């Protein structure tokens, strides 16, 4: 049986989060917990992903609008068995159905593949975990390797309480069997709910074999019911990613102070200082150095470039042998060529900057093209917006723009031109020209400053 579908339980409110956000939308590594689970289901090549939703329905659908899921509404949350009953009409008899939880984001493809492989031809397979302190969890009771029961803490004998293997709730069986067992579930218990743990008893009654696979790491199956548990998942996940990067040759100044909230592709001899955040898809070339406190989102950085402390780069690219920062901001559409220098308190947006050009201090460059070998002085502003529309500034090669210059777009400064400090440029500048628009300097001898009136 090669066909497989996944059911993700995501209808809970998450009262202990004390939040208006549905629990499964709280994030780990910058991504909603349920999105992690959906991505894992995709890795399994699931034919269908049934998402059981309830609380925060509109918000959940909005945030996951692009996901290929079958939305299954659970009006009342009456237990895990009740949630599965809502999805049962969509099950195909001859496919495996894997049940997952939207608030347990760290489950891996490899563990689930082991679980599916362990499922008997006629039977069910559970994912279990070994805990040093299993207090409060349902114990796995085995006979001859097969699971015969899950005994809750309050019902366990002293001997059963010594068992450290516990139920995670993750399981797999074929669609036909699940539909049969789900139809027989009842809510004859103190909570008046339908539980998937009762399916194990039904399977044994029917003579089906119940297999179990133990997760290698308990954190894979940990859920988050409150923000403390959410923070623990975040730290574990970040530590795991940092470990992988260190083993791949990336130098992290302090693995405990590094956050990867997306995908990082890197070359050799990359150095990352403390409190750096990586978001989206980021590519770092060989010998790249990232300073403390930087944030990189969807950025490409060329070989041997240094991003100095507290710089923010988003949807932008920087060529090789460049220097950015400290305290620089590259906004979407910034494309910097090799050997460029961008200094402190410079903001660049939707602009191309040519090879070797320097923009060193206190400058805004937006909607512009700047050639190679230019010097853009301190306090230069490309005035690109008239309150309604954006206009472009074009600067050729080897242009020198002095300090405190305003370039009022649309305007073009051609190759080799020089703009004197303090000028406001409203007309095109020809190649090789020197342009100044300063008011002539006046001198008044023997000037006396006004004195305060008594």
UniProtKB/Swiss-Prot annotation:
Chain spans, region Pyrophosphorylase: 1-227
Region (N-acetyltransferase): 249-454
Region (Linker): 228-248
Pathway: Nucleotide-sugar biosynthesis; UDP-N-acetyl-alpha-D-glucosamine biosynthesis; N-acetyl-alpha-D-glucosamine 1-phosphate from alpha-D-glucosamine 6-phosphate (route II): step 2/2; Nucleotide-sugar biosynthesis; UDP-N-acetyl-alpha-D-glucosamine biosynthesis; UDP-N-acetyl-alpha-D-glucosamine from N-acetyl-alpha-D-glucosamine 1-phosphate: step 1/1; Bacterial outer membrane biogenesis; LPS lipid A biosynthesis
PROSITE patterns: HEXAPEP_TRANSFERASES
Reaction(s) catalysed by this chain's protein: alpha-D-glucosamine 1-phosphate + acetyl-CoA = N-acetyl-alpha-D-glucosamine 1-phosphate + CoA + H(+); N-acetyl-alpha-D-glucosamine 1-phosphate + UTP + H(+) = UDP-N-acetyl-alpha-D-glucosamine + diphosphate
Cofactor note: Binds 1 Mg(2+) ion per subunit.
NCBIfam families with a match to the protein in the record: glmU, PRK09451.1
Protein's name according to its UniProt entry: Bifunctional protein GlmU
Organism: Actinobacillus succinogenes (strain ATCC 55618 / DSM 22257 / CCUG 43843 / 130Z)
């Amino acid at each position: 049986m090669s066909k497989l579908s996944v059911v993700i339980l995501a209808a809970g409110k998450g009262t202990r989060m004390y939040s208006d956000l549905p629990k499964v939308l709280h994030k780990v590594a910058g991504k909603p917990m349920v999105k992690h689970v959906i991505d894992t289901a995709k890795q399994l090549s699931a034919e269908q992903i049934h998402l059981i939703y309830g609380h925060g329905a509109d918000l959940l659908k909005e945030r996951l609008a692009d996901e290929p899921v079958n939305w299954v509404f659970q009006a009342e949350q009456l237990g895990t068995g009740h949630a599965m009953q809502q999805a049962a009409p969509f099950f195909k008899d001859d496919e495996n159905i894997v049940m997952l939880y939207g608030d347990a984001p760290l489950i891996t493809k490899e563990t689930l593949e082991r679980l599916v492989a362990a499922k008997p031809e006629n039977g069910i397979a559970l994912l279990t975990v070994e805990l040093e302190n299993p207090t409060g969890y349902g114990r796995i009771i085995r006979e001859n390797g097969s699971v015969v029961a899950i005994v809750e803490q309050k019902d366990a004998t002293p001997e059963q309480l010594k068992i450290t293997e516990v139920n995670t709730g993750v399981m797999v069986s074929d669609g036909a069997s699940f539909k049969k067992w789900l139809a027989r579930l009842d809510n004859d218990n103190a909570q008046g709910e339908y539980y998937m743990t009762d399916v194990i008893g039904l399977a044994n009654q029917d003579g089906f074999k119940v297999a179990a696979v133990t997760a290698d790491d308990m954190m894979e199956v940990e859920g988050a019911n409150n923000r403390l548990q959410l923070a623990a998942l975040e730290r574990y996940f970040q530590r795991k990613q940092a470990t992988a990067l260190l083993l791949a040759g990336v130098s992290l100044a302090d693995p405990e102070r590094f956050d990867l909230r997306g995908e990082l592709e890197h070359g050799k001899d990359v150095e990352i200082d403390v409190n750096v955040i990586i978001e989206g898809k980021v590519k770092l070339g060989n010998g790249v150095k990232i300073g403390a406190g930087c944030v990189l989102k969807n950025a490409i950085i060329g070989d041997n470039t240094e991003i100095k402390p507290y710089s923010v780069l988003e949807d932008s690219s920087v060529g090789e042998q460049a220097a950015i920062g400290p305290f620089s901001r590259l906004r979407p559409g910034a494309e910097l060529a090799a050997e460029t220098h961008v200094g402190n308190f410079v903001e660049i947006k939707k602009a191309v900057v040519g090879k070797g050009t320097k923009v060193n201090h206190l400058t805004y460059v937006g909607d512009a093209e700047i050639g190679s070998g230019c010097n853009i002085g301190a306090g230069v502003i490309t005035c690109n917006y008239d309150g309604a529309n954006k206009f472009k500034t074009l600067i050729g090669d080897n242009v020198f723009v002095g300090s405190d210059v305003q370039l009022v777009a649309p305007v073009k400064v051609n190759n080799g031109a020089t703009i004197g400090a303090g000028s406001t440029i409203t007309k095109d500048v020809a190649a090789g020209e020197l342009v100044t628009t300063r008011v002539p300097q006046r001198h008044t001898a023997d000037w006396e400053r006004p004195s305060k009136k008594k």
